[in-house]
Amino acid sequence: MPASLVVGTQWGDEGKAKVIDFLSKDTDIIVRYQGGANAGHTVVVHGKKYVFHLVPSGVIYDQTICVIGNGVVLDPLFFIEECDRLQKEGFPVFDKLLLSDACHLLFPYHSQIDSARETTLSQEHKIGTTKKGIGICYADKMMRTGLRVGDLLDTSYQTRLKHLVDEKNRELDKLYGMPPVSYNDINEGLKFFLSKVKKNIINTAYYLDTELKKGKRVLLEGAQGTGLDVDFGTYPYVTSSNPTTGGALIGTGIPFQHLKHVIGITKAYTTRVGEGPFPTELLGEAGEKLRQKGGEFGATTGRPRRCGWFDVEMLKHSVRINGITSIALTKIDILSDYDTIPVATGYKLNGKTLDCFPSQGLDKVEVIYEEFPGWKSDISGICEFQKLPEKCKNYISALEKWIGVKINLVSTGPDRKDTIHGDSF
């Protein structure tokens, strides 16, 4: 059975968790492949909201095994807190969760250094990090100095950890004038973490390959989106990993032959958190109106998201990079009650129309817009395409034509049931 991938096409917060939740009922295994606790996935089931940061949202389904892949950076105590919270809400997390032995561990010194670096930068050089230590942990991974989950299975890790803590404390003191972190506190935390998850630690790449060959249905989920990819996003205003298709394969160990479906998730408008260029951004009252209508505040930090119109060039870029085979369009209901809805269909730079989404100079482009007549009726909760207002259907059809990929799922509200899918079109 081939694997499927859900990937964000914008700057994250596209509604991946809802789509993953919708697809989970037909899935045996869900795998998180990159990122860390800097991401928040929100799922609403029967009016109750659940927020996930590290644990795959498929944990709420009885039949689904959840896997944390090798591409994730894991804050061990935050992870246990999240698992315990979900256990109290009735989900047997520890009975259905597998953890890659190659997953890198994130420690307090990572977040402290991250926060210190961001604080010392001038406003024009700030990245807009969540200060969770994600990038610093990935840097240690690339420097080959980090500790992995599997290292904890041998007590010799303590020698390496002591050396790392001493090194990071020197950095905290000499560069940032910050107090040291405690080796003993970190080590005791790791012992507690291991006592909870030791039986869950395995070679997940081998496990996934074995299960796929048995015909199991596997769904890959990431954090953030293509616009935040460290290689193909709006660098340097990006995350420190690859949320794109290539990152999914590396972050799970699944070979490309197993991957057949790549589902791109996109909002019917655009948002981003933090710094960086945003060509279609709405400022002032217009931006605030869309933010309030869409409830655009970060699930992890609570930060207000910047809001703007749909960007076709960005979506075409995401389709190319990820090999997207279908699109799920979310939050179309938020656009109700607009007289007109502009869509960015291209860019000009120095008077010349660009062929594609640029790697540099996005902050200097002139946006080419086409306007669509809006619809006034409330479409929240509609589950059949034909019941949508004609102007809404025209908007969706135009996006599909420009993107060049079939839109076969439309979300009309936060709940699982507020979804138009498949035969409804």
Swiss-Prot record:
> Which CDD domains does the entry link to?
AdSS (cd03108)
Q: Name one GO molecular function term.
A: magnesium ion binding
Q: What does the function comment of this entry state?
A: Plays an important role in the de novo pathway of purine nucleotide biosynthesis. Catalyzes the first committed step in the biosynthesis of AMP from IMP.
Location (main, coarse): cytoplasm
Cofactor binding description: Binds 1 Mg(2+) ion per subunit.
Q: Which UniProt keywords apply?
A: Cytoplasm, GTP-binding, Ligase, Magnesium, Metal-binding, Nucleotide-binding, Purine biosynthesis
The GO annotation for biological process reads: 'de novo' AMP biosynthetic process; IMP metabolic process
Which residues act catalytically here? Answer: D13 (proton acceptor), H41 (proton donor)
* Pathway recorded for this protein: Purine metabolism; AMP biosynthesis via de novo pathway; AMP from IMP: step 1/2
Give the UniProt subcellular location, in the record's own words.
Cytoplasm
Q: Where does substrate bind?
A: A299, T300, T301, G302, R303, P304, R305
Cellular component terms per the entry's GO annotation: cytoplasm
* Family under the similarity heading: Belongs to the adenylosuccinate synthetase family.
Instruction: List positions binding GTP.
Output: 12-18, 40-42, 305, 331-333, 411-413
Record SMART domains? Adenylsucc_synt
Catalytic reactions on record:
IMP + L-aspartate + GTP = N(6)-(1,2-dicarboxyethyl)-AMP + GDP + phosphate + 2 H(+)
Supply the EC number(s): 6.3.4.4
Q: What NCBIfam families is this protein classified in?
A: PRK01117.1 (NF002223), purA (TIGR00184)
The residues that hold Mg(2+) are: D13, G40
**InterPro entries found in the cross-reference section:** Adenylosuccin_syn_GTP-bd, Adenylosuccinate_synth_dom1, Adenylosuccinate_synth_dom2, Adenylosuccinate_synth_dom3, Adenylosuccinate_synthetase, P-loop_NTPase
Protein name (Swiss-Prot/TrEMBL): Adenylosuccinate synthetase
Q: Where does IMP bind?
A: D13, E14, G15, K16, N38, A39, G40, H41, T130, R144, Q224, T239, R303
Cross-referenced Pfam families:
Adenylsucc_synt (PF00709)
